[in-house]
Amino acid sequence: MGKSAKILVVDDDPDMREALQMILESAGYTVVMAEDGKQCLSKLKEEQPDLLILDLLMPRMDGFEVCKALKDPRYAKYARMPIIILSSVQEGVSHRRYELETGVRLDVDDYVEKPIESSVLLERVGKIIKRIAKE
């Protein structure tokens, strides 16, 4: 799989989507984009990505709802989809805060803080891609 892995980036901010696309494509990844959770669920079926990079706070359907939807039997095929959450909250606080606020355990692989540092993002994406390549 390696660098040819396909990554679905979901963020309502077009500038953030473009920045993430540039960072990921410069490292050799294939990038598909969606602007909200509803579009994300459609793209999952169409594109069959290897990894989902998901903003939590979006209009129409947010990241919380996407994580919850992936537990639904209709999306059982994607239940083990690796997810990196984009968060503007400090990483050490994010997981506890979001679990408390939503009452739903977010089963995600990692968190990346906004503003995004490309080296941090690429390191975390690389770790997940290597892990899933071994599965």
Language model features: what each stretch is:
Residues 18-26:
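Charged docking surfaces used in two-component/phosphorelay signaling
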Residues 65, 79, 90-110, 119, ...:
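Alpha4 helix (beta4-alpha4-beta5 surface) of REC/receiver domains from two-component response regulators
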Residues 55, 87:
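Active-site residues of response regulator receiver
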Residues 28-35, 43, 112:
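Short hydrophobic/Thr-rich beta-strand motif most characteristic of the beta2 strand and flanking loop
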Residues 36-39, 62-70:
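Acidic catalytic/metal-coordinating carboxylates
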Residues 47-53:
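Active-site beta3 strand of CheY-like receiver
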Residues 1-6, 119-135:
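Non-catalytic signal-transmission and effector/linker regions of two-component phosphorelay proteins
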Residues 58:
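Receiver (REC) domain active-site loop signature in two-component systems and cognate sites
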